[in-house]
């Protein structure tokens, strides 16, 4: 068994930790955070002012995540007062936040489907998808949970 030194940023101290199950990162409290590689994938389409969003989250491990939150930011104004799925809420005029639910280590969560009306009939929209919260886990590969997708108003589905 080997030991590794974990430097706690901002604390000016180091904590000794057993490397045990593999790599982990330090939180601000000096506690070793679990490592989980959360990723989001799905499809987007836009046609006649209706924006269709499908997002599925998965965890490449090695640790499970009790819950995570994915943020969807839209470049176009959305009609106010639209109803969202039970696992989602409005985070602003152009932002929707959705819970993923539990993500097992090396497992996939459910898919969330959202139909949104835009103000007017835009020619295109840009949608940014990213993880806002992952239960405090360290994610050494955040690139697979951050996407910026151009969605032309063709009715075609654009995968991310």
Predicted regions mapped to residue ranges:
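Short solvent-exposed strand-capping/beta-turn motif centered on an Asx-Ser/Thr pair
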Residues: 58-64, 75-77, 119-121
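Low-complexity, intrinsically disordered segments enriched in Ser/Thr together with acidic residues
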Residues: 102-125
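Serine/threonine-enriched low-complexity regions used as flexible
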Residues: 53-55, 119-148
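Short beta-strand elements of extracellular/lumenal beta-sandwich folds
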Residues: 39-66
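Low-complexity, acidic Ser/Thr/Pro/Gly-rich terminal tails and inter-domain linkers that flank the onset
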Residues: 18-48, 79, 158-160
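Short, low-complexity, Pro/Ser/Thr/Gly-rich segments in the mature regions of secreted, periplasmic
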Residues: 148-160
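A surface/secretory-pathway sequence property marking extracellular, secreted
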Residues: 67-97, 102, 146, 159
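Secretory targeting and sorting signals
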Residues: 1-19
């Amino acid at each position: 068994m080997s030991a590794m030194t974990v430097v706690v940023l901002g604390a000016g101290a180091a904590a000794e930790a057993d490397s045990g199950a593999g790599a982990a990162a330090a939180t601000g409290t000096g506690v070793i955070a679990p490592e989980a590689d959360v990723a989001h994938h799905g499809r987007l389409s836009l046609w006649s002012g209706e924006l269709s969003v499908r997002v599925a989250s998965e965890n490449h491990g090695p640790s499970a995540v009790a819950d995570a939150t994915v943020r969807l930011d839209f470049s176009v104004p959305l009609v106010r007062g639209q109803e969202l799925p039970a696992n989602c809420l409005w985070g602003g005029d152009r932002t929707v936040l959705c819970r993923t639910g539990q993500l097992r280590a090396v497992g996939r969560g459910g898919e969330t489907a959202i139909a949104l009306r835009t103000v007017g009939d835009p020619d295109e929209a840009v949608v940014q998808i990213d993880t806002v919260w992952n239960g405090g886990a360290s994610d050494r590969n955040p690139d697979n949970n951050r996407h910026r997708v151009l969605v032309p108003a063709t009715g075609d589905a654009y995968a991310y």
